[in-house]
Amino acid sequence: MRPVNERTHVLTIAVEDYFHVAALRGAVRDAHWSRLEPRLERNLDATLELLARHSARATFFVFGRIAETQPELVRRIAEAGHEVASRGYWPRATAGMSEAEFLEDLHRARRALEAAGANRIVGYRSPTWIGARELWKLDVLAEEGYLYDASINPRLWSFAG
């Protein structure tokens, strides 16, 4: 047990390239991603090195598609002792997804992450925030064996992700 006066911090990292973020959706089409210089691997390596230097651990939320196309990144995260958690399969908003679509996204992401070398996937963070009308997704996550969700934004922003 930790001493009462010892501080504990939680660090989570969204594993995505700069052009995956929701803020660029209107400016950069998915079809153009292959034309852009990827920075994910370089930035991930720098992050893992920084965490190792400080003996720190983090939770890395990874898209299933990244696990499929770059499984070595997931292996490096897991081998360094960090938690690998799910961000779903690919950066698309979960708002408006039916339960069947949401389940398929969860299953596809989990299969990809585990195939890439991640241990048991128990955490989830949606590519965009989960709002009040989507709280049913928390029940689905629990039924699928997830122990926590990090998708709820306590602020009422009109744009998030």
Residue ranges and their predicted role:
Residues 1-123, 129-161:
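Catalytic alpha-helical scaffold of carbohydrate-active enzymes acting on polysaccharides/glycoconjugates
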